[in-house]
């Protein structure tokens, strides 16, 4: 999660259009979907033309013999590392990519590097249309890039070293905040030696030291559905030491259906809903259990106990 300064452009008002019934467009049954596929392909072709002239895909020339094709954070790293020692094609629209602009740009340089983290999406496209570029043969597929890494790969020059302290900086991995009520919960779960099926949120940190009590985290809501599957597969004895842990906002988002499945399939799982009345990890926004809308207007508050009882949870 991050934050940054942004520049606002002039707000454009878009007038509401009249509503028209058009099930051929909006009801995606197979017969309609086949016809709409033609529209999708036409739209992509139109986007290809737009990408060729869009200011989001721009060329920055410095009179260099080295060309750099990059977008996003990789572009910023390249600019920091290489400065005016390279020319740049800054990609702002990554799909569809501007084939003509890329070919025209690449034709001017002795070497063209594609700098992108992880999978070689732009690089593979360039090679597929006959553009000779240098990419993952000098850059790694894994992890995050740095300006010094890029400078070494492109110019074979080490970046200047900064003054460092003699003693290494103490390692401080992320942990639950001081005073967080989840700390006590995971401390107890660890002491009891339970198998904990975790979920997405601050409490995912229950997997890290010193608590180290969460055994699995897959996706939102999976703490309940995965534990339900474990109990069915491994039996009653295993289920006695198994517990699901999910936050209030994640439960509202995608945990309810898993709990319904437990009731429907006659399961007997233990589920802990960590109700801290906030969406703690991703913005501190309200959710249906807080009694306020996203605009901080008072609204009906979902009662978790009543909700669980309404789908058949008895204890």
Describe each PLM feature range:
Residues 193-209:
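Acidic-glycine-rich active-site phosphate/pyrophosphate-binding loop
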């Amino acid at each position: 999660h991050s934050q940054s300064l942004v520049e606002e452009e002039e707000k454009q008002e878009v007038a509401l259009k009249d509503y028209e019934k058009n099930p051929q467009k909006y009801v995606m049954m197979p017969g309609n979907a086949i016809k709409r596929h033609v529209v999708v392909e036409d739209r992509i072709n139109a986007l290809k033309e737009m990408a060729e002239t869009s200011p989001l895909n721009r060329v920055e020339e410095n009179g260099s013999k080295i060309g750099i094709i990059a977008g996003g954070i990789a572009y910023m790293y390249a600019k920091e590392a290489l400065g005016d020692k390279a020319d740049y094609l800054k990609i702002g629209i990554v799909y569809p990519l501007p084939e003509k602009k890329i070919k025209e740009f690449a034709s001017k340089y002795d070497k063209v590097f594609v700098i992108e983290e992880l999978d070689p999406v732009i690089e593979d496209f360039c090679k597929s249309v006959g553009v000779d570029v240098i990419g993952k043969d000098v850059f790694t597929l894994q992890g995050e890039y740095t300006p010094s890494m890029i400078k070494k790969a492109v110019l074979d020059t080490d970046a200047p070293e900064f003054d460092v302290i003699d003693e290494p900086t103490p390692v401080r991995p992320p942990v639950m905040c001081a005073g967080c009520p989840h700390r006590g919960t995971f401390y107890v779960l660890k002491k009891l030696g339970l198998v904990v099926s975790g979920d997405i949120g601050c409490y995912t940190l229950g997997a890290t030291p010193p608590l180290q009590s969460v055994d699995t985290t897959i996706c939102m809501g999976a703490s309940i559905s995965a534990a339900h599957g474990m109990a069915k597969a491994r039996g009653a004895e295993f289920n006695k030491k198994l517990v699901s842990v999910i936050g209030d906002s994640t439960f509202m988002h995608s945990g309810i259906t898993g709990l319904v499945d437990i009731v429907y399939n006659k399961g007997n799982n233990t589920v802990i809903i960590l109700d801290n009345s906030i969406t703690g990890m991703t913005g501190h926004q309200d959710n249906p259990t807080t009694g306020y809308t996203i605009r901080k207007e008072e609204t009906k508050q979902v009662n978790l106990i009543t909700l669980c009882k309404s789908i058949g949870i008895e204890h």
